[in-house]
Structures are given as structure tokens and as C-alpha cells.
Amino acid sequence: MSGHNKWSTIKHKKGAADAKRGKVFTKLIKEISVAAKLGGGDPAANPRLRTAVDKAKAENMPKDNIERAIKKGAGGMEGVTYEEIVYEGYGPGGAAVLVEVMTDNRNRSVSEIRSIFTKANGNMGEAGCVAWMFSKKGLITFDKGLDFEQLFEAAIEAGAEDVSEEDEQFEVTTDPSSFIEVREALVAKGFSFANAEVTMIPQTMVALEGKQAESMLKLMDKLEDNDDVQNVYSNFDISADEMEKMM
């Protein structure tokens, strides 16, 4: 399995997605509001907002919640100022970790994130210590069952950089600037995607097992549980056999 969606696959298998839906909604509402504040409340003219709204719809967020979040952001979010920060560090076994934070209190966030790293036998590093290990890309995944050759041809024609076949899905990779264009071109041709997002893809992977693997999953869980954290990326890899031992 390719590593860049390893964590999302593990979360799905653990059944964590439904259990934490309320927290997911909270993070999405924050992203929608900030996107609307920065780029306006029209998703058609604001790519960041459009992506956030599409993600919220994919999580089955009620339409009213989405509209309220847009209205709040477009209205200026009086009295609330969020700062976007990326923290970097190392998890167990030297796995690289990127943590995207949206916070109204930088001091609180850095203290909490540092504590989470330390308790999981990791450590928070300086800016730039691991960012170079990742590339920002658009990633569109499709469940198997459709024709790979047709998807490949349509995706490349639409401007995708690569199309690959993984263990459980087909993956279309794009430049971030052409992500929405490629996604909509594929939808227009009848391809229904399982997930679509702009993400950070690691260039190399770090294999973990045993206690290190367990500690890494706990670190990822704790980071995502933090209210200020929007996204977490890592280059760890845990084999299917190792996952079976931990489930």
C-alpha cells in the first residue's frame, strides 16, 4: 500500500471515522469559515472554499451547517482571528510528521503539540526539518470496480500527473493548481471518486513494527484529537501483517 493514505486507511479499519465525526465537523466548519473570510463566500470563485465545502459534503455535513459557516466567514468573523501554522517533528522510529494547525492562540497550540510529541516518544523539531520530505499534491481515489485503462486515459487527458493502482484503490495524482479541474473532468465523464483532497505526499517511507507502530498510531490519534489541528501527515508505513497483530 502506498504510504500517503496509510493513516486514512488505518482510521477506516479502526472505525475511528464515525466515532469522531463531531470533531471532523468542527474542523471542517473552521476551514470553511476561514476560507470564506480570506477569499469570499462564493465557492465558484474561491477554490479553497470550494474544496472545503466538497469535503464537508463528502462527510455528510448538513447543508445548513455549511451555509452558516460560509456566512460566518464572509461576514468577517468579528473578534476571531485564526493563524495557520505548520509544526514539524519526528515520531517513533524517526517517522516524519507534519501538523497543520489553525489556532487563535499560538502559545497554547505549540505547548500542546510539543507535549503530544513528547508523550508518544517523539519530538517536535524546527521549521523545515521534515517538510522537504513531502510534496503537495492533489489526490483523487477511486474504489476498484471501474475500468483502469479508461480512468488512466481520462485522467491524463484532463491533466493528471499520474494514475496508479494500489492494493484497494486507484489513485490519480495532480498538481495542486489543476486538482479541481481534473476532479471535475473525471466526474463529468462518469467516474465517481471515493475521496478527493489536496494533501502532502511523502517521498520515502519509514517502516514501523511492534511498540513503535503502536506508539505512532497513538501519536496520530492524539494529534488529530487536538482542537487546533486541521491535518496530520506522516511517512510511516505499517505492514498488513503488523496491523493484524494490533487490531
Curated annotation (Swiss-Prot):
Keyword DNA-binding: yes
Chain coiled-coil ranges: none
GO molecular function, one term: DNA binding
Any single Gene Ontology cellular-component annotation: cytosol
Location, primary (coarse class): cytoplasm
UniProt keyword annotations, A-Z: Cytoplasm, DNA-binding, Transcription, Transcription regulation
Localization (cell): Cytoplasm
InterPro entries given in the database record: Integrase-like_N, TACO1_YebC-like_2nd/3rd_dom, TACO1_YebC_N, Transcrip_reg_TACO1-like, Transcrip_reg_TACO1-like_dom3, YebC-like
GO-annotated biological processes: regulation of DNA-templated transcription
Disulfide bonds: none
Keyword DNA-binding attached: yes
Superkingdom per UniProt: Bacteria
Family of the protein in this entry: Belongs to the TACO1 family.
Protein name, UniProt field: Probable transcriptional regulatory protein Ppro_2673
Organism of provenance: Pelobacter propionicus (strain DSM 2379 / NBRC 103807 / OttBd1)
